[in-house]
Amino acid sequence: MSDLLKVQDLHMWIQTDKGLNHILQGVQLDIQPGEIHGLIGESGCGKTMMTKATLNLIDPKRTVIRGHIEFDGQELGKLPEKERRKIGGSRIGYITQDPLTALNPLYTVGEQIAEMLRYHKGMKKKEAAEEAARQLERVGIKPGAEMAKRYPHQFSGGQLQRICIAMAVCCEPKLLFADEPTTALDVTTQAQILDLLKSLQKNGLAILLITHDFGVVSEICERVSVMEKGIIVEEGLTDEIFQNPQKAYTKRLIDSAVRKEGAYE
């Protein structure tokens, strides 16, 4: 099976007041169609920056990138910027860590999902509004037509995360980047969001789950890549990594999950 996403020797430098900071140091990562792949590491290790490099969500004036990123057979670095940005949202969905930062407080959630559909799918206003309501129901926000008229502040944290998932998958992407989607949620809501992601995978969606918590990885990820200081230090099947971690850093991450009550068995 050919890889859906293939990252090879990816380097990133960010300009700071003290000079160039080498954020990503030769990252190697591949994601297969329809799999849930975990990318785990401590905060600040470069997980989010890798996804932003893939989606071109960076400041070119302050950032230098080297390496190869291939998605669905296309070398992203060779695409015009406009075409590459269109891939984000239509063929690659993205859920940020904080749903409030992804939603505009001045517009209803239905309007924001509909805008995605109009931009990427070319839908007319009425058609997009109806599809937005359907997408809300798809992620458990019901009744969709009524909820679509509400503003972000009228929803709970768990509901907002569901809405962000609806926005990320409304254009039927092949790949979803889920960046710490459960971090700010209680245990019950966290389990519901993970179940939702698993249900989306059953429809053929590949997911890169970005987290610092091995307990979350153990719940839904088939494979996992461990990142330390901008480098993938270990990669393999989740069960094998749990049972026989090769790196001390990986073992510390697993031990921290074990110490959390009920993290995994």
Q: What is each of the regions a protein language model found here?
A:
Residues C170-K174:
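A short, proline-enriched helix->beta-strand linker immediately N-terminal to the Walker B motif
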Residues V217-E219:
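A short, surface-exposed alpha-helical micro-motif characterized by mixed small hydrophobic
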Residues T63-E75:
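Conserved ABC transporter NBD signature motif
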Residues E235-G236, N244:
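ABC ATPase "signature
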